Regions:
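Transmembrane helical cores of multi-pass ion-transport proteins
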Residues: 1-292
Length: 292
């Protein structure tokens, strides 16, 4: 690897990690589980798919689409059933890859790709409005003006910095710069600590504490199948998008196998399920990331 490529990948990876952590915590809260489960899942899935997957430059982690799928299971049956579901869902993904079904993504029409990407962009944009609320009420007065000012300043950095220099990713400069500004001026803004209490150690290997019988299988199987289908679809469409952006071709079957193994590992170590994340992938590619 050339030094310039290594530098670009390191900076892009740092940028993506800053964006990935709060998102995975937020998705864990959506799924009504401990935020640590989101962090465990993000680390395990991102690491394994990066090392063994078939699409360099693509970012995977504990995704929001997976959180929405399994929230009802968590509410009704608890976290241990979620871990078993992640295990089974990973097994389905693994089988999908081993059967070489990933290449079917090449048959998806381009308009579907456009609809997928733009639909996710709208969802991501709409999701930002909740940050303009506090305790169910819209921000007003100084708090609102401060939020709007920081958002505008962040967008200006991302938009204008590439016109001055491309030595560093603009998203990384915006995150670090605005973070430092808020800290130095002691501005009254919300932090990750306000979203949830995050404390704990490293994950440990343990089987889900559930009765291993057909009744349990009947409970988790529908969620596992749905989780696998949603995860595979989002992953393969993101892989297709990455192919278009980089003008290279990935290996969808290999990515499916790696994603399945990653989800099974996450389930064994107490993490959430996950798949490719289009938002983080676009940030990574836009920051110059092309490698693993």
């Amino acid at each position: 690897m050339k030094p310039a490529s290594l530098r670009a990948d390191l900076l892009a990876g740092l940028t993506s990690s800053f964006a990935l952590v709060p998102e995975c915590i937020a998705f864990a809260l959506v799924a009504q589980v401990n935020p640590l489960m989101g962090l465990y899942g993000a680390f395990i899935i991102c690491t394994l798919t990066a090392l063994f997957g078939g699409r360099p430059g693509m970012i995977s982690g504990a995704a929001g689409s997976m959180a929405v799928v399994i929230v009802a299971l968590v509410v009704q049956h608890g976290v241990q059933y979620l871990l078993a579901t992640v295990l089974l869902g990973g097994l389905i993904m693994l089988a999908f890859g081993l059967l070489r079904l990933g290449k079917l993504i090449r048959m998806v029409p381009h308009p579907v790709m456009l609809g997928f990407v733009n639909g996710l962009a709208i969802i991501i944009a709409l999701a930002q409005f909740e940050h303009f609320q506090h305790d169910g009420h819209w921000l007003q007065g100084k708090a609102l003006y401060l939020m709007l000012g920081l958002v505008a300043l962040t967008m200006l950095i991302v938009y204008l910095l590439p016109r001055l220099t491309r030595a560093v990713p603009p998203a990384l400069v915006a995150i670090l710069g605005i973070g430092a500004l808020v800290y130095l001026l002691d501005l009254p803004t919300h932090t990750l600590g306000d979203m949830a209490q995050i404390a704990g150690g490293l994950p440990s290997l343990v089987l889900p504490d559930i009765p291993w019988n057909l009744d349990t299988l009947a409970i988790i199987a529908p969620y596992a199948i749905l989780m696998a289908l949603v995860g595979l679809l989002e992953t393969l469409l993101t892989l297709n998008l990455t192919d278009e952006i980089t003008a290279t071709r990935g290996h969808p079957d290999r990515e499916c196998v790696a994603l399945g193994v990653a989800n099974m590992t996450s389930g064994l170590f107490g993490g959430m399920g996950g798949c490719a994340m289009i938002g983080q992938t676009v940030i990574n590619l836009g920051s110059g990331g092309r490698g693993r």
